[in-house]
């Protein structure tokens, strides 16, 4: 019995131990299961029929569940299932920046080459104002239309694929621009670059308006290409910038943004250098080998080859760009680290999220526009654009009137100083912000200081001036045989000269003439690397020097020497002013990105670029056109009866217009940044409300004591 009892007790103990082991294993299993369930995203917990939390999520939770910042979006570098291990070293922000800079360079270079082809169309087709406006500004109009739409929908998906699509569009538009130069006759061969006073001038063929073959087709192709160009730029400058901002620490954003923005101007400069090569005349050996009717193909071959090269590079960049994932490795961790940084956004936007429906979308745009920090910096971006384009538009005219430089050289000098000044300004501004790790308020102060310095340097250039030379037909009446404001006089009336060719010459009488034809010159040759002119009927005074063959020289190519040595000083001041005026660009962009929540960055940039492109497409062209009309003294009236361009300006009026528009744009930046500095703490922290309450409490305490 005792043995049986002991056996039963042992069995009972064994059952208890087994039960305890079973409970222990079950508890461990539950513990493991609970630990495993905690790693499942919230979206998948619904399928486990777990109770839903009725409490509304906080802004931090909204940020974590946003699929754009989810760690699950971080993937390898590859094309779908094709993932190569040895290329994963490029799956970082530096690898993306390499391709991004290439895309921006292509966009800038294409913009420069298109501007040059527009000048060809203007000369060859005698464009009307409406045609010229549509061909020049249709890209801005297209950008204005699609900027906010691309910012809204592009931020929800894979932004690198949007940029890859932009590269494909740039390739397609390059082919559109190349097609007219490959197919149609645009550049008419045999046109004189320097016109002399000859009887043949009366017999030349004059083709006007729609009588030019394939004129309308070329214009339509150009406008279509410009529209695609404007659309292609928005994903690059909106989604690309936000992608960079999301994958770098806030303290380092200035350096990366500076590289991206400087690349656009570098691309434009490279496009100018490459496009100028196409203006060089082909060798005589090649022109002799082909038929005269096909000479235009040789003249135009450089242009369509340039466009096709750009298209090939664009397609290559798009193929590599599409391999990047939605988020680079480490993006989610970086986003969590940014949450711990001091607040910089408008406190009213703290818990907002983008609504999917139209009403909510418009409501979000309205709230962004109500953000004073974002709105002031968006207007600063507009003013920065006006400042830069004022330089590009007015500086060549100022150099022509003030320093008597020919239009071609004035345009080259403008590009040689303004574009590098903009590049250096963009890069220095971003580098200084990056190295000093400025807060938003300090960035506002930095923008204010650099703008004030640029205004001071700009004022100095107007103390640099030269004496105006005598110009026949403009401020001199051909020794009494002509009228002021009329280039035609008795001495050149029979020459039938055209004002479409502005090739100024300096006569031995120390007077400047619009062209050899208006000086009545009948012969020319190159003497000691200098073009000289002979038998000029309008030049009757002055000492005549002889050339190597004993013939008396009446005039030489170029403007008359005014003994003005102040041009280097002028460019020193102007280059410095350009650098300082562009140093505010990167701080402005970074403030726009940091003054809104992370899920609003693309939309805020979209609103900013929509404002900039609208001003660039409507008010700015009207302003520049009106100011040009007011200051113009002599227009180019073509043989078809239309005004094409202004050749000569009133010096004083042009200076006042140049100074007024440039300084007004900079002063707007100064005033807006002073205002933004004053309200920064209020917008971010809400200190005015607290201070008002404190003052009220102090008054109540004084009244109680009284």
UniProtKB/Swiss-Prot annotation:
GO molecular function: organic anion transmembrane transporter activity
Subunit structure: Component of the CatSper complex or CatSpermasome composed of the core pore-forming members CATSPER1, CATSPER2, CATSPER3 and CATSPER4 as well as auxiliary members CATSPERB, CATSPERG2, CATSPERD, CATSPERE, CATSPERZ, C2CD6/CATSPERT, SLCO6C1, TMEM249, TMEM262 and EFCAB9. HSPA1 may be an additional auxiliary complex member. The core complex members CATSPER1, CATSPER2, CATSPER3 and CATSPER4 form a heterotetrameric channel.
Site, as annotated: Reactive bond: 499-500
Gene: Slco6c1
InterPro entries (UniProt xref): Kazal_dom, Kazal_dom_sf, MFS_trans_sf, OATP
One GO cellular component term: CatSper complex
Domain Kazal-like, chain residue ranges per copy: 485-540
Region (Disordered): 1-24
Protein name: Solute carrier organic anion transporter family member 6C1
Disulphide-bridged cysteine pairs: 491-521, 497-517, 506-538
Highest taxon in the source lineage: Eukaryota
Glycosylation sites: 214, 486, 535
Family label: Belongs to the organo anion transporter (TC 2.A.60) family.
Segments on the Cytoplasmic side according to the record's topology features: 1-94, 152-159, 242-253, 325-374, 433-445, 590-604, 676-706
Extracellular side: 119-130, 181-218, 278-301, 397-410, 467-565, 625-652
Extent of Basic and acidic residues compositional bias: 7-24
């Amino acid at each position: 019995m005792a043995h049986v009892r002991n056996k039963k007790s042992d069995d009972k103990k064994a059952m208890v131990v087994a039960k305890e082991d079973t409970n222990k294993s079950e508890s461990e299993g539950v513990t493991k299961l609970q630990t495993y369930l905690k790693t499942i995203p919230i979206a998948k917990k619904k399928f486990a029929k777990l109770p839903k939390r009725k409490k509304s999520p906080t802004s931090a939770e909204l940020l974590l569940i946003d699929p754009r910042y989810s760690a699950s979006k971080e993937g390898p570098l590859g094309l779908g299932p094709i993932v190569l291990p040895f290329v994963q070293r490029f799956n970082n922000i530096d690898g993306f920046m390499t391709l991004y800079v290439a895309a921006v360079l292509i966009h800038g270079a294409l913009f420069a080459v298109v501007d040059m082809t527009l000048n060809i169309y203007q000369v060859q087709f005698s464009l009307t104002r409406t045609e010229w406006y549509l061909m020049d500004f249709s890209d801005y109009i297209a950008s204005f239309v699609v900027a906010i739409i691309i910012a809204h929908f592009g931020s929800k998906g894979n932004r690198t694929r949007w940029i890859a699509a932009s590269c494909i569009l740039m390739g397609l538009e390059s082919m559109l621009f190349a097609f007219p130069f490959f197919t149609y006759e645009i550049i008419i061969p045999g046109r004189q670059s320097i016109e002399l006073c000859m009887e043949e001038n009366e017999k030349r063929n004059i083709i006007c308006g729609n009588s030019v073959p394939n004129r309308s087709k070329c214009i339509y192709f150009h406008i279509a290409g410009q529209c695609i160009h404007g659309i292609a730029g928005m994903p690059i400058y909106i989604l690309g910038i936000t992608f960079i901002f999301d994958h770098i620490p806030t303290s380092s954003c200035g350096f990366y943004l500076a590289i991206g923005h400087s690349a656009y101007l570098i691309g434009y400069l490279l496009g100018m250098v490459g496009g100028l090569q196409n203006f060089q005349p082909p060798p005589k050996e090649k022109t002799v080998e082909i038929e005269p009717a096909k000479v235009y193909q040789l003249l135009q071959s450089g242009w369509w080859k340039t466009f096709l090269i750009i298209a090939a590079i664009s397609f290559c960049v798009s193929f590599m760009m599409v391999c990047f994932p939605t988020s680079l490795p480490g993006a989610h961790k970086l986003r969590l680290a940014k949450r711990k940084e001091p607040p910089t956004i408008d406190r009213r936007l703290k818990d907002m999220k983008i609504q999917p429906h139209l009403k909510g979308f418009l409501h979000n745009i309205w709230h962004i526009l109500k953000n004073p920090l974002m709105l002031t910096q968006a207007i600063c971006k507009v003013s920065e654009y006006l400042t830069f384009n004022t330089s590009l538009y007015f500086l060549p005219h100022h150099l022509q009137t003030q320093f008597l430089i020919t239009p071609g050289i004035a345009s080259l000098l403008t590009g040689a100083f303004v574009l590098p000044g903009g590049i250096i300004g963009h890069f220095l501004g971003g580098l200084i912000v990056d190295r000093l790790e400025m807060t938003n308020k300090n960035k506002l102060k930095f923008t204010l200081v650099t703008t004030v310095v640029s205004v001071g340097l700009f004022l100095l250039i107007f103390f640099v001036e030269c004496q105006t030379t005598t110009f026949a037909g403009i401020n001199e009446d051909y020794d009494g045989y002509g009228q002021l404001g009329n280039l035609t006089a008795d001495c050149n009336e029979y020459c039938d000269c055209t004002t479409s060719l502005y090739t100024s010459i300096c006569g031995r009488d120390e007077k400047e003439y619009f062209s050899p034809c208006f000086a009545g010159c009948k012969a020319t040759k190159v003497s000691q690397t200098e073009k000289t002119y002979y038998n000029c009927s309008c030049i009757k005074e002055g000492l005549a020097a002889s050339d190597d063959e004993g013939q008396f020289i009446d005039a030489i190519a170029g403007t008359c020497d005014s003994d003005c040595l102040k041009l280097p000083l002028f460019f020193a001041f102007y280059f410095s002013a350009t650098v300082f005026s562009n140093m505010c660009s990167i701080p402005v962009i970074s403030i726009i990105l940091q003054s809104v929540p992370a899920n609003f960055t693309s939309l805020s940039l979209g609103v900013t670029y929509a404002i900039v492109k609208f001003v660039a497409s409507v008010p700015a062209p009207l302003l520049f056109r009106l100011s040009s009309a007011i200051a113009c003294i002599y227009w180019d009236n073509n043989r078809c009866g239309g005004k094409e361009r202004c050749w000569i300006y009133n010096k004083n009026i042009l200076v006042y217009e140049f100074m007024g528009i440039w300084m007004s744009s900079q002063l707007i930046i100064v005033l807006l940044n002073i205002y933004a500095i004053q309200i920064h703490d209020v917008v971010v922290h809400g200190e005015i409300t607290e201070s008002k309450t404190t003052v009220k409490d102090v008054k109540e305490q004084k009244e109680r004591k009284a």
